Amino acid sequence: MKKIIKISFLFVAIFCMTATLQAQKFGYVNSALILSEMPEIKQADSNLEALQKQLMKKGEGMVQLFQKDYAEIQQKVAKGELSPVQQEEQAKNLESRQIEIQKFEQEMQEQMVAKREELYKPIYDKVNDAIKQVAKEGGYQMIFDAATILYGEEGADVSSLVKTKLGI
């Protein structure tokens, strides 16, 4: 009797494990490809490029003005038009402006990163929502990004389903 119970329990356990293994469904998406095809990304890239050009123009203006003033001061020094005290004042002024330019360069990079996050976050959220919808509708337990998959069957690629959800 105990033997029959043990065997029955073993069969039930094996049946449950096989049912669980067969029920799991995995897929993958090529998120980089999906993002590259989205018009929103193209618009965000365009906005970032415009901001970068604007900031670069301002930075270049600051550098050109600095170089012009530096050249003028050097000419005055060469002609003997500046006293040692005035030379020191001008040197301090140029040094503070150089620090200002360096700060601007750092702020420019920070602005670009912040703007990129601001523009891309809603797009990434939209793609993630579409992936979640496809997963729920298709009964997928997990969907991976193709960038992390070394091999995957073509049938497991749900990129086209996600593109359809996104309207691309």
Predicted regions and their residues:
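Bacterial N-terminal signal peptides that target proteins for export
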Residues: M1-F9
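Sec/Tat signal peptide C-region and signal peptidase I cleavage site
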Residues: M17-A23
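Cleavable N-terminal signal peptides
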Residues: L10-F11, L21
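Short, solvent-exposed mixed-charge patches
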Residues: G167-I168
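Amphipathic alpha-helical segments
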Residues: Q24-A146
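Short beta-strand-centered segments that line the small-molecule binding cleft or hinge
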Residues: S159
